[in-house]
């Protein structure tokens, strides 16, 4: 299987996985709120998902090094499907939180495996573009998913999108089984299997790198905006303060996602051409300004303007931090490095 065929295959798989997350994103806060709980518990539905990823990313990276990438790319969607199906069946907030944790675990398995898979098939000069392509697939799924989720919830009920996502997870696992060959080399497997206990610290040497820790801080900020603000607080604010309905929320989130779809490939090209740091600094600033506007906005147009600015910044930043981490890591650190990188994003 040629490199670009592998890239296309992993991108299709990512679209399917992330469409599921996009489908539930606009309705999750409303679904949790329907249990009559506090705003803190509504936010906990996102926290539970993120906590599972936080705890799973590094073990997933190590598992990818030891047992191969395919197990994560197939098993992750199946675990997510189970979590989503259970979320739809939940009759208390605590059951919902438990199944959200399971769904997050599956998400971590897949996304960590997919990132390592990309680094296996990309040269150093291609990393920005390959990561951008996969993030573009992610944005397609997350971007178009909300409109579908809003329409499904409006047509049926708030639990139906979870069942749709569960079916999609099973289909993704089947697709990955037939279309994604193993990319871990025999030499990588031998190193991971035979490494002596005394050599283990070398895998974590990146934690002593100032550059790695700084890009980790940037990653924390970018992912916090996406999950903590855009997926939790923004839907509630738009619904409660500006009166948007669930289908309107879905369309707005889709529009924001389209910004990323348009910008992510040029961002990957720029990352490879001009360097990672040149992209990271100005776009991180743009994200901060956009969220500041959202925080003080008292009109819908101003609120949407702030959201748009943060979406533009997030889209252009996209591939740069991951490519930067890949540049810092040696081949035997790859699984641990990507696990740590994704852990920063889930803090």
Protein language model annotation of sequence segments:
Residues 36, 68, 89-94, 243, ...:
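Helix-breaking motifs and short loop linkers at transmembrane-helix boundaries and internal kinks
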Residues 1-3, 181-215:
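Juxtamembrane intracellular "pre-TM" segments in multi-pass secondary transporters
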Residues 56-68, 263-275:
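Helix-to-loop junctions at the C-terminal end of transmembrane segments
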Residues 83, 94-102, 290, 301-309:
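Paired small-residue
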Residues 167-189:
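C-terminal membrane-cytosol helix-exit motif in multi-pass small-molecule transporters
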Residues 27-39, 232-247:
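Short amphipathic helix-loop junctions that connect adjacent transmembrane helices
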Residues 99-138, 323-324:
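Cytoplasmic helix-loop-helix junction between adjacent transmembrane helices
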Residues 71-85, 278-293:
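Structural signature of the two symmetry-related core transmembrane helices
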């Amino acid at each position: 299987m040629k490199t670009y065929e592998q890239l296309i295959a992993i991108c299709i798989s990512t679209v399917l996985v992330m469409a599921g997350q996009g489908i539930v994103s606009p309705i999750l806060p409303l679904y949790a709120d329907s249990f009559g709980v506090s705003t803190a518990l509504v936010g906990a539905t996102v926290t539970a998902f993120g906590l599972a990823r936080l705890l799973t990313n590094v073990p997933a990276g190590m598992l990818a090094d030891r047992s191969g990438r395919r197990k994560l790319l197939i098993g992750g969607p199946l675990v997510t499907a189970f979590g989503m199906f259970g979320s739809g069946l939940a009759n208390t907030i605590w059951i919902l939180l438990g199944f959200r944790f399971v769904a997050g675990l599956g998400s971590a398995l897949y996304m960590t495996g997919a990132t390592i898979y990309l680094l296996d098939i990309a040269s150093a000069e291609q990393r920005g573009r390959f990561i951008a392509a996969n993030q573009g697939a992610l944005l397609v799924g997350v971007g178009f998913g909300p409109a579908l989720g809003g329409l499904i919830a409006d047509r049926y009920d708030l639990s139906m999108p979870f069942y749709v996502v569960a079916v999609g997870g099973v289909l993704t696992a089947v697709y990955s089984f037939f279309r994604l060959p193993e990319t871990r080399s025999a030499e990588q497997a031998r190193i991971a299997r035979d490494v002596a206990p005394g050599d283990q610290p070398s895998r974590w040497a990146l934690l002593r790198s100032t550059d790695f820790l700084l890009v980790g801080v940037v990653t924390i900020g970018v992912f916090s905006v996406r999950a903590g603000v855009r997926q939790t607080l923004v839907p509630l604010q738009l619904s409660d303060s500006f009166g948007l309905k669930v289908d309107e929320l879905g369309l707005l989130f889709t529009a924001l996602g389209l910004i990323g779809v348009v910008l992510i490939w040029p961002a990957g090209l720029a990352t490879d051409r001009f360097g990672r740091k040149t992209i990271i600094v100005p776009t991180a600033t743009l994200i901060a300004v956009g969220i500041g506007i959202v925080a003080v906005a008292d009109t819908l147009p101003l609120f949407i303007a702030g959201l748009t600015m943060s979406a533009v910044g997030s889209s252009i930043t996209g591939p740069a931090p991951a490519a930067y981490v890949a540049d810092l890591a040696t081949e035997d650190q790859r699984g641990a490095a990507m696990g740590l990188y994704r852990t920063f994003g889930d803090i």
